[in-house]
Design a protein with these regions (language model features):
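C-terminal catalytic histidine-bearing segment of alpha/beta-hydrolase fold enzymes
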Residues: 2-28, 35-51, 314, 323-373
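N-terminal cap/lid segment of alpha/beta-hydrolase-fold proteins
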Residues: 17, 25, 29-57, 61, ...
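Short beta-strand element of the alpha/beta-hydrolase
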Residues: 155-166
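Serine-hydrolase catalytic-loop signature spanning alpha/beta hydrolases and amidase-signature enzymes
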Residues: 166-169, 174, 190, 216
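Short amphipathic alpha-helix adjacent to the substrate-entry channel of hydrolases
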Residues: 173-191
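Primarily recognizes the serine-hydrolase "nucleophile elbow" in alpha/beta-hydrolase
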Residues: 212-282
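Short beta-strand/loop motif that positions the catalytic acidic residue
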Residues: 293, 299-301, 305
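Conserved alpha/beta-hydrolase "acid-adjacent" motif
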Residues: 306-315
Length: 373
């Protein structure tokens, strides 16, 4: 009995089937089963083909059991083709949203198609340097990385990014790296920060840290670069929750916090903070804030997100666009799970190009480079 082959197709089969359907129960388990295979299904298909050819060459797939295993492998291959189709559709969805706003996204085939096909690992390009683990506070979690072009003469806008993971875990070196690298190549100063986690820190602590990082970006611009009049805040999941709250908060000159020029929310969670109810004195959901002073906002979410349902992003988009005088982009990605920005995948590359197009008015006047180097 080909035990190794059976284990291979069992793992691929469970992950593929779970990724194909929209899971509404056991969402966190579904996320861990599908996060990787959903972004690089072509590599899973390659593994499946290689394993099948190897099993055939060794004579392991004979008799009734062998026939059944081949049929199962064939069905899994078809499922992986469907996941690939959904992943590659992201580019047309992003391009359509951009066109609705009178903008075109980049047609760089090397970065949009070839790189995700052959090497989906989000390594930092040679043109970008990272200055790491800089403190913005006394706590060990109050650290940030700065990403800049190695040509120190470039003077672009500033992006401040916050990671997700439910305010309870996470790292600033797992998510958003493709976006950080992409903008840094274009001359932006990109800051990716960690923050204290619950239960040791609470809602007001997180917001205070977000404001502290924004002030740090302004106060250290002469050292690390960046135009303090063009600061963009971004985040994923819990980081997007923090970003949306900051973007929709009314201006408060007493806090001396730089006003952000735009916001980027990737697979945002928008609920009330843990343990809070409707009687909270300070709103912890962006849906309770007036969007009339909101800057331009970009929202992207997957319709197969099993950790944070896509309905949350739709609600945030509807809330903002009905009250904000500025543009609001919403990209709903077919088949996408939570944390789709962890790899340099077709889907993530498309979203990043959409963000670059969305931020183009803010980046005008910045000396740009044509591609990753």
């Amino acid at each position: 009995m080909p035990i190794g082959y059976i284990i291979t197709i069992l793992i691929i089969g469970v992950c593929t089937f779970t990724a194909l359907i929209r899971v509404t129960r056991f969402g966190i388990l579904a996320f861990y089963l599908t996060m990787v295979i959903n972004e690089i299904p072509h590599l899973a298909a390659l593994l499946l083909v290689f394993s099948t050819v190897l099993a055939l060459s060794e004579g392991d797939l004979h008799g009734l059991l062998g026939s059944v295993l081949l049929i199962v492998a064939g069905l899994e291959f078809v499922g992986l083709l469907e996941l690939t189709r959904r992943a590659t559709r992201a580019r047309s969805v992003v391009a359509s949203t951009a066109a609705d706003h009178g903008v075109q996204i980049s047609n760089d085939a090397a970065q949009s198609w070839i790189r995700p096909l052959v090497f989906p690992v989000p390594l930092r390009p040679g043109a970008v340097k990272r200055i790491g683990r800089l403190p913005y506070g006394d706590h060990p979690r109050q650290r940030l990385d700065v990403y800049r072009h190695r040509n120190g003469d470039l003077f672009g806008p500033i992006l401040v990014y916050f990671h997700g993971d439910g305010y309870s875990s996470g790292s600033n070196r797992n998510e958003g790296r493709v976006l950080l690298h992409r903008l840094a190549v274009q001359g932006w100063t990109c800051i990716s920060a960690t923050y204290r986690l619950r239960p040791d820190a609470g809602f007001t602590d997180h917001l205070d840290e977000a404001r502290t990082v924004l002030r740090w970006a302004r106060d250290n611009s002469e050292i690390h670069g960046g135009d303090v009049t063009r600061i963009v805040m971004a985040g994923s999941s819990a980081g997007a929750h923090m970003t949306a709250l900051t973007a929709l908060a009314p201006p408060n000159s007493a806090e001396a916090v730089p006003r952000i020029a735009a916001a980027v929310c990737l697979y945002p969670w928008i609920g009330r903070y843990f343990g809070r109810g409707e009687d909270e004195s300070q709103p912890s959901t962006p849906l309770a804030l007036d969007p009339s002073t909101a800057p331009p906002i970009f929202i992207a979410h997957g319709d197969h997100d099993s950790w944070v349902p896509v309905e949350e992003a739709r609600a945030l988009y509807d809330h903002i666009r009905t009250g904000s005088p500025n543009t609001t982009w919403y990209v709903e990605l077919p088949g996408a799970q939570h944390a789709f920005d962890a790899l340099f995948s077709w889907r993530n590359a498309a979203v990043v190009e959409g963000i670059v197009a969305f931020l183009r008015p803010i980046g005008e006047g910045t000396e740009l480079t044509d591609s990753y180097r």
